[in-house]
Amino acid sequence: MIENKINKLKELINKYNLDGYIIPKNDAYFAEFSSPDRLKIISDFSGSAGFAIILKKKNYLFVDGRYTLQSEIECGKYFKIIEIPKTLPKIILKKLDKKLVIGYDPQLFTSINLKKLFGNSCNLSAIDSNLVDKIYKEKPKKYVNSFYNLDANITGVSVSNKVNR
């Protein structure tokens, strides 16, 4: 199943004239629990932090030390697992033959984050629509959590005062 999704994504990578595509764990709001969890969709990785770079010939999953073993078990067959911050993508991409064009969803990254991760190691290309969304037909339900008001004696200000600011 993972292999099929990766292959479909690689077809889109070719269609968009890219050398690769970045898939983060976060959503557009940088929420810890995101829906859809595109990283899990493409890799089956269920940890709460990480990102993947799918290249034409190699797939990388970047995780912090908490998830090294877990990621090997869940998706090590299809991804080279890289522990961050020991190794950043820019170090790996600089070792490749040419300067790659890597696509990304601009709603899921900040320019500061991209610069930190990739530096000048590749050419980054913002793609209008998320490529994982294009291949994934069974959209999961949106993660929705209820919200509630806390009393002003806890927060120091009432909801109406805060909204009116």
Model-inferred region functions:
Residues 1-97, 105-109, 113-165:
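N-terminal accessory/capping or targeting/presequence segment of soluble
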Residues 102:
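Ligand-binding face of N-terminal immunoglobulin V-set domains in extracellular IgSF glycoproteins
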